[in-house]
Amino acid sequence: MSTTERRRTSARRETLLGDQPGAFASARYARITPMKARRVVDMVRGLPVDEALSLLQFAPQSASETVYKVLESAVANAELTEGLERGDLVVSVAQVDEGPTMKRWRPRAQGRATRINKRTSHITLVVQPADVVAEKKATPKKRKSA
């Protein structure tokens, strides 16, 4: 197999998608607390891409802007690298991991200080064709034997 035939895949893509069609995008070190970002991500998980984008566009949460940008990026990756149609894409995986926390100090009365935790998030979204997602749900999971 020549180098032009071989398709380079990252380890991250292997863990998120395996050999199935789809694309992903992530925003790392986003200045949003993970709890607030998870509220927004939970709204779009499993939705068709167009519906999820319209939902995010008018969502009042501050995290919805960042999630919107990540979803747009994932759709663009699917269209350009995979050649998939935007209309039949579904948000199959949506996860928010905790990033590093920046510690800051706020002066208080009588010479004291309290700590402020400025939390960050790693937001990852995976888009796949609807038929692949439906097929994945239809296959039964293997049970662990004791």
From Swiss-Prot:
Q: How does the annotation summarize its subunit structure?
A: Part of the 50S ribosomal subunit.
Q: Which GO terms describe its cellular component?
A: cytosolic large ribosomal subunit
Q: Which NCBIfam families match?
A: rplV_bact
From which domain of life does this come? Bacteria
UniProt family annotation: Belongs to the universal ribosomal protein uL22 family.
The name under which this protein is listed is: Large ribosomal subunit protein uL22
Pfam families attached here? Ribosomal_L22
Q: Which UniProt keywords apply?
A: Ribonucleoprotein, Ribosomal protein, RNA-binding, rRNA-binding
Physiological role: This protein binds specifically to 23S rRNA; its binding is stimulated by other ribosomal proteins, e.g. L4, L17, and L20. It is important during the early stages of 50S assembly. It makes multiple contacts with different domains of the 23S rRNA in the assembled 50S subunit and ribosome. The globular domain of the protein is located near the polypeptide exit tunnel on the outside of the subunit, while an extended beta-hairpin is found that lines the wall of the exit tunnel in the center of the 70S ribosome.
Q: Which GO terms describe its biological process?
A: translation
Q: Which InterPro entries match?
A: Ribosomal_uL22, Ribosomal_uL22_bac/chlpt-type, Ribosomal_uL22_bac/org-type, Ribosomal_uL22_CS, Ribosomal_uL22_sf
Q: Name one GO molecular function term.
A: rRNA binding
Entry's PANTHER family?
CHLOROPLAST 50S RIBOSOMAL PROTEIN L22-RELATED, LARGE RIBOSOMAL SUBUNIT PROTEIN UL22M
